[in-house]
Amino acid sequence: MKKRIKQFANYVDEKEREHGPYRLLILSNNDIHDPNRTGPLIVEMAKKMNLEVFAADYRGAWTELDDKGQRWIHSFPVGDDGAVPLPTGKEPIEYEKPFKMDPTDTLIMNRGIHVPGITGNQSWYDMSKIFEYEGYTMINGTECHLNCSSKWMNQILFERHKINTPKTVIISHKEGAREAFERLDSDFPLILKTSNGSRGVGVIWVESKKSLEATVQLLYRENEYIDVLLQEYIETKYDVRAIVVAGDVVGSMKRPVPPGDFRSNVAQGSEPVPHDLTKLEIDECIRAAKSVDGLVTGVDFIPGADRERDKPFFIEVNSTPGLIGIEEVLKKEFSVTTEILKKFFNRTRWKDHPAKPDRTMVGPRTYPIKNKQGV
């Protein structure tokens, strides 16, 4: 009888873990050129939902397994604004109380991992890989971040999965503009963009062969290893940002193109408004998110001429979508951030539905290696 009661208690405990509150770790980086505004928003909403949440910054963060095999993460204190006061060398280094981790109840949002060796440290990527090896659910996984860190990889995946997108070719050297133009087989105006970039930065309007060649040469003069894309221009009055979570669209907004510009990014002056999607647009957004292996993504597209019948043109998928803008736009209806967090009460939405730690592929016991002073 006692054995049956214990088995039933274990069953109930397992079901509660599958459909209930979880613990949330937010790993991010507060860059002076790209402030971490979404991280504090997620912390705020998670606390309102009574979730245990820990904010950590990649700079200075380290993780370890203790003698009992328990995983912990340490971080400098992260302020309410997402900023992290870094050590100066004049005062003792202080860490937050370490956060206990377990893949059965800890969800990790790793925002701001960027591109290893280019816009972020390789160690940030490596730390995320350790967590993946141990069965943690990552929002998003390292593969998704790599897929989305390059607009060219976005295009490759779109084509592989037959997702409608503007014609795009890559310009691989400073004298490659003319050849790329011929391969694209599209008329001016065209869009020139760097493969790595966000918020509309690095996107250029090109109206002639002369300006195309001159701009490409200038870009390669500044950085000989830059990747430059040439893309057909799809005329539109607005584009759309949809937030896709575990196979569902939880919110969307329309971003009108500001007067005198061709970009619709909020950072470039667009004033977004709520926007309802058609069934076709919803289905295609979900496919686009799946193509990059994303669990929570921001999907950007230009609507088709007939939104009910014509597939939209997908521009890119973002693996760390900013939520401040869409939260503000939809706040009278609901909180997008809260809806995202609520989705993961259901453990079946977690990546591979982890049940227990996998210690067969762990990294070093302490990462990065620390000295006695913790640095």
Model-derived features with residue positions:
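Short glycine-enriched loops at secondary-structure junctions
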Residues: 143-148, 249, 255-256, 302-308
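Phosphate-binding site of ATP-dependent enzymes
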Residues: 201-288
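A short glycine-rich, hydrophobically flanked beta-strand micro-motif that places a catalytic Asp/Glu
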Residues: 230-232, 294-306
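C-terminal active-site "lid" helix and adjoining low-complexity regulatory extension at the edge
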Residues: 4, 8-14, 276, 290, ...
